[in-house]
Amino acid sequence: MEHADQYSWIIPFVPLPIPILIGMGLLLFPTATKNLRRMWAFPNILLLSIVMIFSLDLSIQQINGSSIYQYVWSWTINNDFSFEFGYFIDSLTSIMSILITTVGIFVLIYSDNYMSHDEGYLRFFAYMSLFNTSMLGLVTSCNLIQIYIFWELVGMCSYLLIGFWFTRPAAANACQKAFVTNRIGDFGLLLGILGFYWITGSFEFQDLFEIFNNLIYNNEVHFLFVTLCASLLFAGAVAKSAQFPLHVWLPDAMEGPTPISALIHAATMVAAGIFLVARLLPLFIVIPYIMNLISLIGIITVLLGATLALAQNDIKRGLAYSTMSQLGYMMLALGMGSYRAALFHLITHAYSKALLFLASGSIIHSMEAIVGYSPEKSQNMVFMGGLRKHVPVTQIAFLVGTLSLCGIPPLACFWSKDEILSDSWLYSPIFAIIAWSTAGLTAFYMFRIYLLTFEGHLNVHFQKYSGKKSSSFYSIKLWGKEEQKIINRNFRLFPLLTLTMNNNEQPYTIGGKKEARITITNFGYKKAFSYPHESDNTMLFPMLILLLFTLFVGAIAIPFNQEGMHLDILSKLLTPSINLLHQNSNDFEDSYQFFKNATFSVSIACFGIFTAFLLYKPFYSSVQNLNLLNSFVKRGPKRILLDKMIYLIYDWSYNRGYIDMFYSISLTKGIRGLAELTHFFDRRVIDGITNGVGITSFFVGESVKYLGGSRISFYLLLYLVYVFIFLVISYFILF
């Protein structure tokens, strides 16, 4: 094993030649490089595949004999300070390396076709290679300073890719928003690193953990200061992993190309925050207040992400809030001390979410042929529906990813999420109730997305919409090259809750406001429309492989053993595993508890799915005059109250909980107001004092000149009087 580990330093640098060669090619041979741009995908995929094979070898050796290998080079040494640069190989490193490389390979294969017509094809692949290099460098870092360097590189690459289509104002604003939000967390991370160096005198993980534990055990450190430093470290993870209250950048990050959305949400940027907390868990675990803070932030994010996903029109934004909620589950597990469950869910969620994003990219790709190249239209579920018969392979992939995220066995996320839900009962009943309730919400909003996208009929054909520029509803805008005209931004999916087929029924009224209903009655419309088409094989192949991962990756950590069979590979890989909730366990009791909790969690998920079907499954042909909500609550005061509550919830969710608005008012406008006040104080007060002294001197001089009548004798007399007064004042002050 030692022989393989000695060459582990090469892992981050294998993909690095690609952006260097692309840059040199564009500088030296720009025409040839652009003409042969598709050739760069192959070496990119090949080099990342080499890293994947190397990571698999490391993981196998970790399973056979778990150990930690660290190698460092002295970078700067003097009498006061020494810094070492190296790599750190353990089970967490091997897991993250496999995750980054496998998801990265599938995303690169997918991107070759998805980005083939984009002018920024070469730039995209250069950024992607640098992104993978940065993330691999992060997970192999051996100290906090090295982590911070690669942490910033990961952030830089994500900003470049979020703002990839920088000519579009929305993409540029999203890039700025991600940058500013993450600056807050990164500044906290840097302060926390410096604080712990001041306490322990070391940046190296093993030395840091050992010294800090001894200081805590001997009560030789100020506990409040330690808690503050640990909170600052955690702030970096909060921003990077889009945890409340620094989550606002993640939905807007969907302005980047869909493949990068898959990579960010599955294996790179948002995973970096979870990795940081997992890496520093031996540090956090001796500070109970920090563990409570981590679990509290996690459970708030779980619930907030799920509720904000309920009424999103944009398919990618809905998936983004789903990612936020699932990251909250991972953070909750880490805060509870359930290290294994958190990493297990990180793995299963990565493959499931990568599958969902690549499938959504296939959907967007097919919709662009009808509505044009504009995210406001091609990603809008208002225009979708009935895609099941047009993109069947994509539909199957999206359905499998949806079922996995809902926690339906035997798919990947079922095993990991159920373990977190089970552990939550041991930690806090209140947290458990919230976590289990959110599992039902997850099933509801995920199937809402699925039903609005794939079931029913293609809504774009019944919206009086045309993809031509003459349309009064939208104008085609090619990535910011043209002015956007009329956009109906207030169109919401709340009316889809009440499907009515009765042409004579009046619009529905809430609180004096008329809410229009979508009524589709004439399916015999003869006008020929263009229809979506299935994506090419190079886009479908990665989706099918990820589908297999989603089906079978849960087998690496089946949480119970049969006689003679040891199926829990993940626990072997994570030996010794940190778990504060299962220090003493019995296999039979654990198996019984697992089946009991699994039955309950699947029942909650099925209830969420059933509710989504009731509200969003179209009944166009079979029940022409059925208003579904009327089957449960007849029209009257109770029905009006129910509708007001539903509208209130959907309005709150649609507007992102008004959190972005609050930040805009309190922070953005507040800072602008402070800047204007500072400018006023500087110009009117500070400059006023300076200018006032000059003006006063001028008028005093003119007054003296006028009184003296231009006689030198008077000036001398006045001068002597002033000197005498000055001497008198000085005498009384000194003596």
Curated annotation (Swiss-Prot):
NDH is composed of at least 16 different subunits, 5 of which are encoded in the nucleus. InterPro entries: NADH_UbQ_OxRdtase_chlpt_su5_C (IPR002128), NADHpl_OxRdtase_5_subgr (IPR018393), ND/Mrp_TM (IPR001750), NU5C-like (IPR003945), Proton_antipo_N (IPR001516). Its main location: plastid. Gene3D superfamilies: 1.20.5.2700. NDH shuttles electrons from NAD(P)H:plastoquinone, via FMN and iron-sulfur (Fe-S) centers, to quinones in the photosynthetic chain and possibly in a chloroplast respiratory chain. The immediate electron acceptor for the enzyme in this species is believed to be plastoquinone. Couples the redox reaction to proton translocation, and thus conserves the redox energy in a proton gradient. Its EC number is 7.1.1.-. It comes from the Eukaryota. PANTHER family: NADH-UBIQUINONE OXIDOREDUCTASE CHAIN 5. GO terms for cellular component: chloroplast thylakoid membrane. GO terms for biological process: ATP synthesis coupled electron transport; electron transport coupled proton transport. It is a multi-pass membrane protein. GO terms for molecular function: NADH dehydrogenase (ubiquinone) activity; quinone binding. This is NAD(P)H-quinone oxidoreductase subunit 5, chloroplastic. Belongs to the complex I subunit 5 family. It is found in: Plastid, Chloroplast thylakoid membrane. It catalyses: a plastoquinone + NADH + (n+1) H(+)(in) = a plastoquinol + NAD(+) + n H(+)(out); a plastoquinone + NADPH + (n+1) H(+)(in) = a plastoquinol + NADP(+) + n H(+)(out). Keywords: Chloroplast, Membrane, NAD, NADP, Plastid, Plastoquinone, Quinone, Thylakoid, Translocase, Transmembrane, Transmembrane helix, Transport. The chain crosses the membrane at residues 9-29, 40-60, 89-109, 125-145, 147-167, 184-204, 219-239, 258-278, 280-300, 327-347, 354-374, 396-416, 425-445, 540-560, 600-620, 714-734. Pfam families: Proton_antipo_C (PF01010), Proton_antipo_M (PF00361), Proton_antipo_N (PF00662). The gene is ndhF.
